Amino acid sequence: MSPTAPISRFPVPELKDLPEDIRARILAVQEKSGFVPNVFLTLAHRPDEFRAFFAYHDALMDKPSGLSKAEREMIVVATSNANQCQYCVIAHGAILRIRAKNALVADQVAVNYRKADITPRQKAMLDFAMKVSQQSYAVDDTDFAALHAHGFSDEDAWDIAGVAAFFGLSNRLANVTGMRPNPEFYAMGR
């Protein structure tokens, strides 16, 4: 990978040219993380879609839930692997390493969650997320029963499905735009 390769096949706007709310959000992320994740710059190409994307992202990923933030990131990483999304596997793999405080599990989930050192509850969660991601038309009562057997509520099932479905959108946008992972993600949480 050449460090000078473009981060997107679409135009990436200059910060100074962005609407104030988007510029403020990007600068806040930069302040917190020390860099600007390329997803922000890539999606800023379409400000209205940027706002809608991050509003839904935040509603799913930041709210109180029966799922921990690490578990939500597990869903992102496992389903992004199935969707062959390099950007999301690398970026959210980094976030998972930090949230789970376990680089080994994060890498295991990124490659094959079925062999990862995770709990049976988390495996059931990821089995459901993968079915939503790859075969949503086949989800039925037996899938909900498997979640219930591990202590998940119907609201938790909605959260699992929401994260898997949202990141299906994100994976497809990242793949189509040719979004490149920031080099900073590779070392985070290691």
What function would you assign to each model-found segment?
Residues 1-190:
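Hydrophobic alpha-helical segments
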